[in-house]
Structures are given as structure tokens and as C-alpha cells.
């Protein structure tokens, strides 16, 4: 498992380097996909870099920017990588820095390894069931995955402010989310609300900066798999709103149900 974690970290960091080159160039070549979401040159470049690492593991890969794989082909996969080469493409285009690279290893529908890299800040989040969840700052000019793993700060981190804190989407605050926030205000009195793009919301809960993350709007498996792995290893739950159980992966329908991340 440690070697697979090293591979996923290398893939995320090298794709982060490639993304930053395009980010700083300002030439994004934006297209609109069939689902009306944006696609940039950086999404495709990141996908290709990640695939070049993960194919060496002989574990199949399901990527947002890869070819569509029929359920009949993948339903018997015991292991697979689930990848979002750039989570938060809208944030990338807006140049606000709130986009991530997400890589997860799934075994028997459950997240086992999670790696999330934030290229603009150099923050790397990673987890396995054996070692737990960690955060470390990366210098992309000079790094070694083994050293990074040993230097990581174990999650959750200490938080001074005990005010009940909710993190929610910057781009997708639904009426149901607003109702949930109001319900928490009724329960707890003062409530802090943080808004962020991409899988940073899951990272913020795993860090202990927020108490919960309600997501009552559409997401796909590649948006959440890595973040769920990290949250679970930090002691949080990612609960499917319909089943009231932990979210499972490599389902026939890759669109997630609503979910709630909490202790």
C-alpha cells in the first residue's frame, strides 16, 4: 500500500507542475463539454501525466477526462483508481487558486488511499488506512515522496475557535444547503460559514477547520473519492443522504447522491 501511495503522490505532484505551467501562461483553451461543464488544456495535460504513473500499477483507472467505461466492464473490478485531473475547473479559469488534483484508490467499493494536491498553495493531503491522514507543504522544485510522508502533520489539526463551522460550495449553494445552515444556527446559535471550491471543502473538514460539509447538489464519484478517503482516516464520516451509510464507489451510476461530511 505504501508503494501505491508513493505512486499516487508522484502522479499528483507531477500533474500539479504541468497544471501550474498552463495556469501561469494564462492560455487555457476552454471548451464546453456535453454536460455544460468547462474543459481546459490543463485538464487533459493533467490526465495524461497521472495516467502515465498509474498505468504502471496495473490497476484500472476511472478518470473524469478518460474514456467512458461501461459498468459491465468495471463492475467486477476489485480495485480501481478514481481520478479528477482538475477538480474545480471553474475556479482554475477564474484564477482564484481553489482547484485540486484528486487521486483515490478504491477496493471493494471503499476508498483506501486518498491524495489531494492544491497546486497553487503547494498543500498536499494524503491518507491510507494504515497510517491515517496527513497534510504537508510541498516545494515542487525539490521533493521526495518518502520524506514528504514522514514530514506530514497528522489530521485533524488543532483548532482554537470552537464555534460550529460549516463549509459549503463556493459555486453551488442550493436552497437545501441554506436551510441546513439555518437549522444549524437554530441548534448552535452562532455558526461560521466557509465557502470554498473543489475538494478543498473535504480537506477543510479533515483538517478540523470545519465541523461538517453538507452537499445537497450534484457531484460525481471523482469529485469525492479522494476526499472521502482522507476524511475517514481523519475520523470523519461521509454519509450518503439516501442510504444513511458511507458512500460507496464504482457504482453503476457515477453521479453521487447528496451527502453530509461530519464527525
Predicted stretch roles:
Residues 19, 43, 54, 89, ...:
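Residue-level signal for inorganic ion chemistry
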Residues 104-202, 246-247, 251-263:
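Acidic beta-strand-loop-alpha-helix segment within the catalytic core
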Residues 79-116:
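Glycine-rich active-site/cofactor-binding loop and its immediate structural neighborhood
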Residues 1-86, 179-182, 196, 203, ...:
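N-terminal subdomain of lithium-sensitive/metallo-dependent phosphomonoesterases centered on the IMPase/IPPase/PAP
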Residues 73-75, 93-97, 127, 252:
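Short glycine/proline-enriched turns and hinge-like loops at secondary-structure junctions
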Residues 58-59, 164, 191, 236:
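A structural micro-motif
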Residues 44, 66, 171-172, 218:
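Short, surface-exposed acidic/glycine-rich loop or hinge patches that mediate macromolecular interfaces
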Residues 1-12, 16-17, 148, 178-187, ...:
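Oxyanion/phosphate-interacting regions
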Amino acid at each position: 500500500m505504501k508503494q501505491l501511495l508513493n505512486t499516487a503522490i508522484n502522479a499528483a505532484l507531477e500533474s500539479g507542475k504541468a497544471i501550474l505551467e498552463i495556469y501561469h501562461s494564462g492560455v487555457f483553451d476552454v471548451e464546453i463539454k456535453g454536460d455544460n461543464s468547462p474543459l481546459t488544456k490543463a485538464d487533459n495535460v493533467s490526465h495524461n501525466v497521472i495516467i502515465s504513473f498509474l498505468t504502471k500499477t496495473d490497476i484500472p483507472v476511472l478518470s473524469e477526462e478518460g474514456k467512458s467505461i461501461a459498468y459491465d466492464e468495471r463492475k467486477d473490478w476489485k480495485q480501481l483508481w478514481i481520478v479528477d485531473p482538475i477538480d474545480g475547473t471553474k475556479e482554475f479559469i477564474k484564477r482564484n487558486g481553489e482547484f485540486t488534483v484528486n487521486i483515490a484508490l478504491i477496493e471493494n467499493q471503499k476508498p483506501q488511499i486518498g491524495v489531494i494536491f492544491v497546486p497553487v498553495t503547494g498543500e498536499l493531503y494524503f491518507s491510507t488506512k494504515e497510517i491515517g491522514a496527513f497534510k504537508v507543504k510541498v516545494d515542487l522544485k525539490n521533493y521526495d515522496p518518502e520524506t514528504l510522508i514522514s514530514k506530514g502533520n497528522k489530521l485533524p489539526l488543532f483548532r482554537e475557535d470552537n464555534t460550529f463551522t460549516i463549509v459549503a460550495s463556493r459555486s453551488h449553494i442550493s436552497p437545501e444547503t441554506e436551510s441546513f445552515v439555518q437549522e444549524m444556527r437554530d441548534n448552535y446559535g452562532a455558526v461560521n460559514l466557509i465557502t470554498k471550491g473543489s475538494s478543498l471543502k473535504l480537506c477543510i473538514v479533515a483538517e478540523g477547520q470545519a465541523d461538517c460539509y453538507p452537499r445537497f447538489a450534484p457531484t460525481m464519484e471523482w469529485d469525492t473519492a479522494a476526499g472521502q478517503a482522507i476524511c475517514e482516516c481523519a475520523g470523519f464520516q461521509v454519509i450518503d443522504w439516501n442510504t444513511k451509510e458511507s458512500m460507496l464507489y464504482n457504482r453503476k451510476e457515477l453521479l453521487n447522491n447528496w451527502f453530509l461530511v461530519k464527525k
